[in-house]
Regions:
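Conserved catalytic core of the tyrosine transesterase superfamily
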Residues: 1-326
Length: 326
């Protein structure tokens, strides 16, 4: 069993956490980067990173791929964590980074459901989970974006959802499906009554970004800041160690989608993210231009959105097979 890094290395990991919090990185990214830094240090017999370079990083990344069997995406995540450690925490110039071999991701087409399949999956889901999955599909949301929605982020009058701090720290506006608006309003009415009750019991405080909570100390207790899909019970915030109410855990919807896909008899590899892929593809099939879809998805580069043009419903790219002419 691997031993933990020495106190000096632990201080380095604490420094890494502090720098990431100063830069407003998400807690998930913080945990990931700290875990990769710890693994890197332990892999090299607890040597200090400032005494290592491209050779040690390449050896570590190769170990992950060959013995760990990780994907190219995971390798690149580890590399990003180590780059941050060297550049931002140790303040080490890294001209030798050109010598680090970056894993090349395989180009895979996204899995997409047909509209009939989307409906079949949604029909198998219980009401609350169906609403969340409906927003993943109807608004093109990532799972974390859906769970992070707060009451104030929905504009029923304009039919819009404001996605705050999406991937890459960007905000964007996407569509609120008209078909889901009444269901979402009903959900919020029920949620508001529940919030009033738990507030009277002193359990109405929601988790907030640290900077916002310092600026608006009353905000965690206000209705407009509450998560639309809150966790059933408050829990200890891993950063402040205070008891707050967070959003619903990701695994709740992931399990519900998995069960619904099985019940619907769909054999495709479907996850929560498949709804977002299907949203983009169906918009393109319905004639919306690529730039509009790019903005709704929040892609910084249109080339990322272009991948969906390869999975449009054209029946083998619209080609007539020679076998059909025999």
């Amino acid at each position: 069993m691997a031993k933990e890094p020495s106190p000096a290395k632990s201080r380095l990991l604490d420094d890494l956490r502090q720098v990431m919090r100063t830069r407003h990185y998400s807690y998930r990214t913080e945990e990931s980067y700290v875990a990769w830094a710890r693994r890197f240090i332990l892999f090299h017999d607890k040597r200090h990173p400032k005494n290592m370079g491209a050779g040690e990083i390449n050896t570590f990344l190769s170990h992950l791929a060959v013995e760990g069997g990780v994907s190219a995406a995971t390798q690149n995540q580890a590399l990003a964590a180590l780059l941050f450690l060297f550049r931002e925490v140790l303040r080490v110039e890294v001209p030798w980074m050109d010598g680090v071999v970056r894993a090349k991701k395989s180009q895979r087409l996204p899995e997409v459901m047909t509209k009939r399949e989307v409906k079949a999956v949604l029909d198998q889901m219980p009401e609350g989970k169906r609403l969340m999955a409906g927003l993943l599909y109807g608004s093109g949301l990532r799972l974390t974006e859906c769970l992070n929605l707060r009451v104030k982020d929905v504009d029923f009058e304009r039919g819009e959802i404001l996605v705050r701090n999406g991937k890459g720290g960007k905000d964007r506006v996407t569509v609120l499906p008209k078909s889901l608006a009444p269901k979402l309003k009903a959900h919020l009415r029920k949620h508001k009554a529940w919030f009033a009750k738990v507030s009277e019991e002193g359990r109405g405080r929601c988790s907030m970004p640290d900077a916002l909570e310092r600026k608006y100390p009353a905000a965690p207790f206000e209705w407009k800041w509450q998560f639309i899909f809150p966790a059933p019970r408050p829990s200890q915030d891993p950063r402040s160690m205070q008891i707050k109410r967070h959003h619903l855990n990701e695994t709740v919807l992931q399990r519900a989608v998995k069960e619904a896909v099985r019940a619907a008899g769909i054999t495709k590899s479907v996850s929560c993210h498949t709804f977002r892929h299907s949203f983009a593809t169906h918009l393109l099939e319905d004639g919306y231009d690529i730039r509009t879809v790019q903005e709704l998805l929040g892609h910084s580069d249109v080339s990322t959105t272009m991948i969906y043009t390869h999975v449009l419903n054209r029946g083998g790219r619209g080609v007539r097979s020679p076998a059909d002419t025999l």
